[in-house]
Every structure is written in structure tokens, then in C-alpha cells.
């Protein structure tokens, strides 16, 4: 039998996120250290053409995923997002595993952001103990989420605005350098696409390897689905925000990568260094310095600190809301379903803060091996969440139509069904399974490295099938699916 799914809009959450908040979450959600720091490594490994093609391909995949999520979130705007859709339209245990894995992923990611924050601050204050900065930033992130959802929304709006402004200025400076208007700048142009093995250095294998990095860079775009549960007029604002995704991908990622590749040759050894500790070799910093802007390192340090805080702020919000929704559905202790007068799930916030703090402490005072395994177990979760979105949307639309509902009644309709979710699922699956494909091409396989890379997959399957075995659930048939908005009519 199919257990009764109790997932509805969680009572008590305040719909205080306005259209401008959602738009900035959609635009700035995935602009972070992946673009500001790690993008140089993609050009170095795959060449300018290979990196650009990888960003365009993964960007197309993410666009399809966001249109799928947009259709689901506009129709059923709940904070459980894809975990809710997974249990309603795929299988209850599937949604259970998606929810717990996503909460755990962000709790660990907050700890990673705390480590990154202290590394960034050490650039300015090398003699100050790093844990002081991490504790300070954890306190700031906690307070932004403690007061109200509007506090999170406002902080994320301004964080994202800083990141977006930086990318726009970067693109303008880059274009001026390329066309020769920026006086005193080092020469730039298409010559960097013809040196050595460019434009496709390393061939197809290098592009596959780069796709992994690019995929991680885009993670965070799905946050808009969770924010839908506290959005004003989600049927109107969610589609508007989702439509921004295509232009964000085109402008902020593709144009930025193109400009970097035209100004800095892929053979520049600085591009391979992608440690947030050394801002001076960020590809953005290198381009600004090529333009004669010698203070670029200090500016980019501040921007990257903003990106780290933004990631931590978003992670705290996402994990808190996911834990709250799990509790409302009876899939986590009920204590986490309690709300403050302002509509904030503070018990869930306390728990997430404690877990994130403990994970951080393992990196500081505990066994580094423990910390690395915690990090590795969460590494796959973003890709698993994307797979869950594609599967849930495909089955949602199929069930919706088979039950006789008119797709024109949907608040937002993905225009590429079924090709969009199918393409996104296949490509995301290839990226997920190909994370460490090089290990299997060597004479001796490093099984420890393989286990560290893929541990997130069996962990997800154990949670899923463990729940399925205990509860006796099965895949939801199309005829059994519930469509609450239509049922209300």
C-alpha cells in the first residue's frame, strides 16, 4: 500500500520573500567561488574552447532543470521542494532520502564555508587565529536566519547584488581590453585560442573532467524551489525568477569564461591554482591586473568573502527549511516543526547550527580524515537532488495529463517536456557516475579514492531502501497521484 503523504504547505511559514528576493536568489544562487576561483582550472584543463563548451552544455542542463523545478514550485510552492515532489510523484522513501541528504549536505557545506571564510580573512589579518573569524561568521549567518525569513531574503539580495555587480564590471573591463579601448592594458584577443593544443586541449576526456567542476559551480540554483514555500504570490514570482536563469547562465558564466580565455592563455600556470586562500591567482584578479588595476586582489578578496557568506547564509536557510518540512511530514522529530512567532523554525535552526559547528570543529581540532569523509559523503547530494528534480517533474507531468488535467491550467509550464527533463537526467547521471572515472583507467585502482568520491551514492540508496523496507512503500502509480491545486477546484 502507499502510505498517506501528508505534505501540504507547511502551516505558519510567512510568505515574506518578494519578487526581487526571488530574482536575486535565482540570479546569484550559483555565483560563488566556483566562478570567481575555480573557473580558471577549467580553462587550464580543457582549453578555452573545451571550457566554454562545457559551461554551455552544463548551463543548458541546469536551465532545463530549473524550468522543471519552476513548473513544480509554481504549482506546489512548499519549502520541502524536490523532497516533497519526490515523495508525492516518485516514491515516499525517495523523497525521504532526498530531504535528509539535502539537509546533511548543506549542514556540512556551512562548515566548509566557515573554513573558507577564515582563509579569506587571513589575507588581511594573517596573525589572527582563524577560528575567531569562523565563529564570528557562524554567528552572523545564524542571526540572519534567526530573526525572520525577510532577514535571510534581504541579506541574500545584497550579497547577490554585490556578486552580480562584480561580474558585470568584470565583463565590461574585459570587453574594453579585448577591443583595445582600455589604455595600458596587456594585449588580448583570439590569439589565445590558437596557441598549443587550443582551443580543445585534452580532448573529450578533459571536457568530461571539466564538466564535473562546472556542475559543482552551478549547484545552488535549486534553492529557489525551497524559497517558493515563503514567497509572496509564488504562481507569479517563481516563473519570473526561473526565466532569469537562461540569461544568468549566458551572461555570468559563458561570457565570463569567454573573456578569461581571451585575455589569459590556458597555459598560464596561475589558472591551475584554485585555492580560495590565494586570491591573487583568481582568474578575475588576473584579468583586472592585466588591465592595470593593481588593487584588484583586495577588491576580489572582499567579493569572494561575500560569496562565501552568501553560500553559508543560503545553506543555513535551505537546511533549516528542509529539516522543518521533514518534521511536519513526520519524517523527523516533531520538535523541529515548532515555529517562532515570526514564522522561523528555530529548533531546526539550532540543530543545523550545532551540526555545522561540530563538522567545522572536526576540521580544526579533530581528525582531518573524519572531516574529509564528512565532506565526501555530501559531495554527491547536489547532483542527486538534480536527478530527483528531473524524475519528479517527468512523473508529475505524466500523471497530471493521464488524470485528465489541462496543462494550460498550470501557473508555469516547462516548454521542453519531455526532452528537457530527459536530457537533464541523462547528462546529470553521466556527471554523477563520472566523478572519478580516471581512477578506473589506471593500472592500479585507488579504491580508497573511489570510495571517498562515490560514498554519497550508497549512503543515499541505504536511506531510501531502508525507509522503503521499514515502511513498505512502493512507487506511486500515476492514478494514485494527488494534485492538490486541482482538487481544490
Swiss-Prot record:
Stored Gene3D superfamilies: Amino acid/polyamine transporter I (1.20.1740.10)
Membrane topology: Multi-pass membrane protein
GO molecular function, one term: L-lysine transmembrane transporter activity
Catalytic reaction(s) noted: L-lysine(out) + H(+)(out) = L-lysine(in) + H(+)(in)
Residues in the signal sequence: none
Effect after changing residue 443 to A: Retains 11% of wild-type lysine uptake activity. Is unable to inhibit CadC
Entry GO terms, CC: membrane; plasma membrane
Assembly description: Interacts strongly with the transcriptional activator CadC in the absence of lysine or at low lysine concentrations. Interaction is markedly attenuated under increasing lysine levels. Concomitant pH-dependent protonation of periplasmic amino acids in both proteins dissolves their electrostatic connections resulting in further destabilization of the CadC/LysP interaction. Low pH promotes oligomerization of LysP.
Record-given protein name: Lysine-specific permease LysP
Taxon lineage: Bacteria, Pseudomonadati, Pseudomonadota, Gammaproteobacteria, Enterobacterales
GN (gene name): lysP
Amino acid at each position: 500500500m502507499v502510505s498517506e503523504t501528508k505534505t501540504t504547505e507547511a502551516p505558519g511559514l510567512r510568505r515574506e520573500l518578494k519578487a526581487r528576493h526571488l530574482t536575486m536568489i535565482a540570479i546569484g544562487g550559483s555565483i560563488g567561488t566556483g566562478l570567481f576561483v575555480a573557473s580558471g582550472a577549467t580553462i587550464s584543463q580543457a582549453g578555452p574552447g573545451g571550457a566554454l563548451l562545457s559551461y554551455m552544455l552544463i548551463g543548458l542542463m541546469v536551465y532545463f532543470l530549473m524550468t522543471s523545478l519552476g513548473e513544480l514550485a509554481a504549482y506546489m510552492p512548499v519549502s520541502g521542494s524536490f523532497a516533497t515532489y519526490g515523495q508525492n510523484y516518485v516514491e515516499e522513501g525517495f523523497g525521504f532520502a532526498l530531504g535528509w541528504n539535502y539537509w546533511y549536505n548543506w549542514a556540512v557545506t556551512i562548515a566548509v564555508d566557515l573554513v573558507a571564510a577564515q582563509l579569506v580573512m587571513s589575507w588581511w589579518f594573517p596573525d589572527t587565529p582563524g577560528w575567531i573569524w569562523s565563529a564570528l561568521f557562524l554567528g552572523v549567518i545564524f542571526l540572519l536566519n534567526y530573526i525572520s525569513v525577510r532577514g535571510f531574503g534581504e541579506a541574500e539580495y545584497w550579497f547577490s547584488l554585490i556578486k552580480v555587480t562584480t561580474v558585470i564590471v568584470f565583463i565590461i573591463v574585459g570587453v574594453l581590453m579585448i577591443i583595445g579601448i582600455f589604455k595600458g592594458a596587456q594585449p588580448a584577443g583570439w590569439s589565445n585560442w590558437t596557441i598549443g593544443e587550443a582551443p580543445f586541449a585534452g580532448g573529450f576526456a578533459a571536457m568530461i573532467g571539466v564538466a564535473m567542476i562546472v556542475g559543482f559551480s552551478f549547484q545552488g540554483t535549486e534553492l529557489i524551489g525551497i524559497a517558493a514555500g515563503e514567497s509572496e504570490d509564488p504562481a507569479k514570482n517563481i516563473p519570473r525568477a526561473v526565466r532569469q536563469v537562461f540569461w544568468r547562465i549566458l551572461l555570468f558564466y559563458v561570457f565570463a569564461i569567454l573573456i578569461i580565455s581571451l585575455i589569459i592563455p590556458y597555459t598560464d600556470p596561475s589558472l591551475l591554482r584554485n585555492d580560495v586562500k590565494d586570491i591573487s591567482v583568481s582568474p578575475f584578479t588576473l584579468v583586472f591586473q592585466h588591465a592595470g588595476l593593481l588593487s584588484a586582489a583586495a577588491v576580489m578578496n572582499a567579493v569572494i568573502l561575500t560569496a562565501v557568506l552568501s553560500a553559508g547564509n543560503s545553506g543555513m536557510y535551505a537546511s533549516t527549511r528542509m529539516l522543518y518540512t521533514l518534521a511536519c511530514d513526520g519524517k523527523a522529530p516533531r520538535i523541529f516543526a515548532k515555529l517562532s512567532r515570526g514564522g522561523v523554525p528555530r529548533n531546526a535552526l539550532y540543530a543545523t547550527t550545532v551540526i555545522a559547528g561540530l563538522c567545522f570543529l572536526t576540521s580544526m581540532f579533530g581528525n582531518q580524515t573524519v572531516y574529509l569523509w564528512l565532506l565526501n559523503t555530501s559531495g554527491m547530494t547536489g547532483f542527486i537532488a538534480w536527478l530527483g528534480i528531473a524524475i519528479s517533474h517527468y512523473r508529475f507531468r505524466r500523471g497530471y495529463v493521464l488524470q485528465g488535467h489541462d496543462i494550460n491550467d498550470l501557473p508555469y509550464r516547462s516548454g521542453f517536456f519531455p526532452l528537457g527533463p530527459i536530457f537533464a537526467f541523462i547528462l546529470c547521471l553521466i556527471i554523477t557516475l563520472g566523478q572519478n572515472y580516471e581512477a578506473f583507467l589506471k593500472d592500479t585502482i585507488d579504491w580508497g579514492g573511489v570510495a571517498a568520491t562515490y560514498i554519497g551514492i550508497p549512503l543515499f540508496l541505504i536511506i531510501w531502501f531502508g525507509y522503503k523496507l521499514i515502511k513498505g512503500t512502493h512507487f506511486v502509480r500515476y492514478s494514485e497521484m494527488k494534485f492538490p491545486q486541482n482538487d481544490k477546484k
